[in-house]
Amino acid sequence: MICKDDHSTLRARFRGFYPVVVDVETAGLDANINALLEIAVATFKMDEYGWLCVDGSLNFHIKSFPGAIIQPESLAFNGIDLNSPLRAAVTEQEALHEIFEMVRQGIKTQGCSRAIIVAHNAFFDHSFLMAAVERVSFMEKNPFHPFVMFDTATLSGLVFGQTVLAKACACAGVFFDKNKAHSALYDTERTAMLFCELVNKWKRLGGWPLTPCCIES
């Protein structure tokens, strides 16, 4: 059977999935006991010629959940000052509500069925997001696929031979300021631009659309 979807749509390109970049900054490496401190997301759209581009973004500073463990070395690594009056932190519930509303609207607008996480070393970001979802009992509201994800570290290793975000961005022609790294919003924006280049490069090389398209036996 030949697919009838227009290949220039987001829906057709990712089999009905709606890709969303997610980046988190945390107070440790264990999603179940360490605090989620920042989260940012970025969404995508296709232009009329089927080139992927960044659509919008959203970010929040997060209040530590009750009983969360804060690792000082993690704060030193990401440079987060929990006592800064500029943080304007919100609860996990408030942040996820706003993010999920944005993502669900994008799914509807693009005619997709479900969101899929795009992240650099995606397992880490995915695990912290899903742990927060469970803490605030948003399982029914969660628009993201429970385990499928696009990992830009893996994709960059395949395409560019680089897995470090800054080096992969350099290969992709995406400017990366190392002084701004480990900000959830900045890393999300860079990862989104990197993902666009990975997808668009495959298109430029003739890898998409498939020929013949989506033939099913």
From Swiss-Prot:
SUPFAM superfamilies in UniProt: Ribonuclease H-like
SMART domains xref list: EXOIII (SM00479)
Protein's name according to its UniProt entry: Ribonuclease T
GO cellular component terms given for this protein: cytosol
EC number(s) given by UniProt: 3.1.13.-
UniProt keyword list: Exonuclease, Hydrolase, Magnesium, Metal-binding, Nuclease, tRNA processing
Active site: H182 (proton donor/acceptor)
Source species, domain of life: Bacteria
Function: Trims short 3' overhangs of a variety of RNA species, leaving a one or two nucleotide 3' overhang. Responsible for the end-turnover of tRNA: specifically removes the terminal AMP residue from uncharged tRNA (tRNA-C-C-A). Also appears to be involved in tRNA biosynthesis.
